[in-house]
């Protein structure tokens, strides 16, 4: 899964540490999310989207193969 978290953080002038504190995770979790090495829970995805006043699908991008297992 690809994410646009880094892009949104830059737009809001926010560090990984600041975002992590806002959503209640460690900075390393944000690092892994941004690198596509971790799929967030629905709850975490929702929290991150709320921080940026965005929709979950604006931040997390699935390709069809990932989504449908093709």
From Swiss-Prot:
<protein>
    <recommendedName>
        <fullName>Uncharacterized HTH-type transcriptional regulator AF_1793</fullName>
    </recommendedName>
</protein>
<keyword id="KW-0804">Transcription</keyword>
<dbReference type="InterPro" id="IPR001387">
    <property type="entry name" value="Cro/C1-type_HTH"/>
</dbReference>
<feature type="DNA-binding region" description="H-T-H motif">
    <location>
        <begin position="16"/>
        <end position="35"/>
    </location>
</feature>
<keyword id="KW-0238">DNA-binding</keyword>
<feature type="domain" description="HTH cro/C1-type">
    <location>
        <begin position="5"/>
        <end position="59"/>
    </location>
</feature>
<dbReference type="Pfam" id="PF01381">
    <property type="entry name" value="HTH_3"/>
</dbReference>
<keyword id="KW-0805">Transcription regulation</keyword>
<dbReference type="InterPro" id="IPR010982">
    <property type="entry name" value="Lambda_DNA-bd_dom_sf"/>
</dbReference>
<dbReference type="GO" id="GO:0003677">
    <property type="term" value="F:DNA binding"/>
</dbReference>
């Amino acid at each position: 899964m690809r994410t646009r978290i880094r892009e949104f953080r830059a737009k809001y002038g926010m560090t990984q540490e600041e975002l992590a504190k806002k959503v209640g995770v460690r900075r390393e979790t944000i690092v892994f999310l941004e690198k596509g090495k971790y799929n967030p829970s629905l709850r975490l995805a929702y929290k991150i989207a709320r921080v940026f006043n965005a929709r979950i699908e604006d931040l997390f991008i699935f390709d069809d193969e990932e989504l449908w297992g093709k």
